[in-house]
């Protein structure tokens, strides 16, 4: 996969040189470049922003530098993701779809956002990572890159490492425990020490259902529930 990022702050992306994403870059599983679109400004002062027509607070990113930076990529039908608080909420399903793409381009917003023509002519996806406003799209882009790259085949050591993640099944993930079995009187649930895989799977399913019910009940509307699941959830409501 190839990922290009158009940003005013390419130096922020050094964080992606570490951990799983950094290893994927080193192994050639993903190729990344970070273009400062200020370098493409034809303004003598290299300005990339201007006042909005019709008035209003703040400054907008102008089309010229971003269009020219984008076309310098000579990309063939990439998926172009524009970061904006008005976009669709990013989720695990998006990451799963994007992980199958050959080429992703991220446009990092700043100031009061982009001139609408950038939205209309360049973006294939307008995406937000939550109901809050950041100073720029760089952190949001790093979040989305991390969530996507880890799903590329062979990036994680084991496929199951992400197949059981929260949201991959539609439910929040169950609790995890490791050694020691008793830490200062805090013990691991007996079922996990039983060696009975059927009981362990049933326990994990119930834990996922309960955690989702108590923390993100909205997710249950989109999960295919068995009769056993429904009975367990009803017991929580009672």
Swiss-Prot record:
Keywords: Cytoplasm, Methyltransferase, S-adenosyl-L-methionine, Transferase, tRNA processing
Pfam family, one: tRNA_m1G_MT
GO biological process: tRNA N1-guanine methylation
One example GO MF annotation: tRNA (guanine(37)-N1)-methyltransferase activity
Cell location: Cytoplasm
EC number(s) per entry: 2.1.1.228
SUPFAM superfamilies listed in its UniProt record: alpha/beta knot
GO terms for cellular component: cytosol
Record: residues binding S-adenosyl-L-methionine: 109, 129-134
Domain of life: Bacteria
Catalytic reaction equation(s): guanosine(37) in tRNA + S-adenosyl-L-methionine = N(1)-methylguanosine(37) in tRNA + S-adenosyl-L-homocysteine + H(+)
Intrachain disulfide bonds: none
HAMAP family cross-referenced by the UniProt entry: TrmD
Subunit structure: Homodimer.
Function comment: Specifically methylates guanosine-37 in various tRNAs.
Family from the record: Belongs to the RNA methyltransferase TrmD family.
Protein name: tRNA (guanine-N(1)-)-methyltransferase
Protein's organism: Exiguobacterium sp. (strain ATCC BAA-1283 / AT1b)
């Amino acid at each position: 996969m190839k990922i290009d990022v158009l940003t005013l702050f390419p130096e922020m992306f050094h964080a992606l040189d570490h951990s799983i994403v950094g290893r994927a870059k080193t192994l050639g599983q993903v190729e990344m470049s970070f273009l400062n679109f200020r370098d493409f400004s034809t303004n003598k002062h290299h300005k990339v922003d201007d006042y909005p027509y019709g008035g209003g607070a703040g400054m907008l990113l102008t089309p010229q530098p971003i269009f020219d930076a984008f076309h310098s990529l000579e990309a063939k039908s990439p998926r172009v993701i524009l970061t904006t608080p008005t976009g669709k909420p990013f989720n695990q399903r998006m990451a799963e779809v994007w992980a199958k793409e050959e080429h992703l381009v991220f446009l990092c917003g700043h100031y009061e956002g982009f001139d609408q023509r950038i939205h209309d002519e360049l973006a294939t996806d307008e995406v937000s990572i939550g109901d809050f406003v950041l100073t720029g799209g760089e952190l949001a882009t790093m979040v989305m890159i991390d969530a996507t790259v880890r799903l590329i085949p062979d990036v994680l050591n084991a496929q199951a490492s992400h197949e059981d993640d929260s949201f991959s099944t539609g439910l929040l993930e169950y609790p995890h425990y490791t050694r020691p079995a008793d830490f200062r009187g805090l013990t691991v649930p007996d079922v996990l020490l039983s060696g009975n895989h059927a009981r362990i799977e049933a326990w994990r399913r119930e834990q996922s259902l309960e955690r989702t019910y108590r923390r993100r009940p909205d997710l249950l509307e989109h999960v295919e529930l068995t009769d056993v699941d429904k009975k367990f959830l009803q017991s929580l409501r009672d």
